[in-house]
Amino acid sequence: HNIDFFNKKFSSEPLIATIGNFDGLHLGHKEIIKRMKSIGTKDNLKSLVIFTEPHAKEFFAEQKDLVDQPTRISPWRDKCKRLKDNKVDYAFFLRFDKKLQRMSPEEFIEKVLSKLNIKYLMIGDDFKFGKERSGDFDFLANWGENNEIKVDRIPTYSFLERRVSSTWIRESIANGDFDLAQKLLDRRYTFSCLLYTSPSPRDNK
């Protein structure tokens, strides 16, 4: 399990961590990272981003055999590269599968968070976790209080009086509004892909 591997390799390093999808690494995500780095520098904590792969919406769409699956802004390799470019020390993903889907909030804390040397946890104000999204900030704050871990809630980051979100960026891209997408991402929208070509008749000669 990548958590056990991470803990074995980096267990001696105290962490400031956050959890989320971080699709596109937009302005709101960058604000969280900025705060993480500031606190981490002050308190001598390494920064860690935990995300799920695939995206939960993609997982549920596949389970329901939906043709139009949710479009992600960037693949996970691009996400990791941009996290590195933004000076995040560590990042790893949790495989979103039926096992993770069915985890209660208590199990998630026991099997994921408690295995990491987290001293400070930062989450978005809309963060939910565990089976049926039953875990929330108050649940994590109570866990943190009992384990001497600071749990902090990050307020909504807004632009044009609307919460910046990956969903909004996907909408702007789908509508062809790349200027808005660029403002929300704080960079030009790009994507990477693999191209497959069929051999030409000449290749068989």
Task: Label each region the model flagged.
Residues Y196-K205:
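Single conserved hydrophobic/aromatic residue that forms the stacking wall/gate
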Residues D43-L45, V88, I149, R187:
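Short glycine/serine/threonine/alanine-rich loop segments
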Residues N7-P75:
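N-terminal catalytic cores of NTP/NDP-binding nucleotidyl/phosphoryl-transfer enzymes
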Residues L94, G124, N204:
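Conserved residues at the C-terminal ends of beta-strands
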